[in-house]
Amino acid sequence: AQVDKDFKHDALGQEAKFRGARLDYFRGDFLWAQAQLDVLKSATSQLIANDALSLSLLISDNMGLDSTTDALMLYARADLLSYRNKNDDALVILDSLHILYPNHSLVDDAWYKEAQIMDMKRNYVAEDSLYGKILAYDSASVIADDALYQRALLHETKLNDKAKALELYQDLIVKYPGSVFVVESRKKYRALRGDVLN
């Protein structure tokens, strides 16, 4: 908190404020965390602004309409455990979330977190399956284009399935034309297809 005050308009201060907001999120103080994150969305550091926006959206999209935060509390706990590299414990909590709240808007976020953990564990087949679940569950999800892009990257770089990667990049370009991943997907698609790039 002191760094946040001493370096209020500096990247270091913004990083400190983000870490504080993330800590509030981990503790379950979602409204306060979101208020802090909303301030950071206009941060000068693009990385901090993107991280703040991402976490703020996660909170706002998944706060219950009746203001219950039980599912979000579970997810935040799993997120904290993953942050602390206690991935097996995080997976247990994410499984609990799927069992207790099978129709909650956090289901796809939980699968995405599980996919990230599977990537760290180098279990690429399970990671691919989880991205597939996200896309089958809700192709209009806020994270659907992220899942599709990560799945394409996975096939290109780790599963060495260039044909599948090509198909997935094309799907992203066609189905999510407004995605931030379109430009990079188009480049990767052309490179995999063998086009001469400038």
Placement of each model-derived feature along the sequence:
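Acidic, polar-rich low-complexity tracts and alpha-helical solenoid repeat scaffolds
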Residues: 1-198
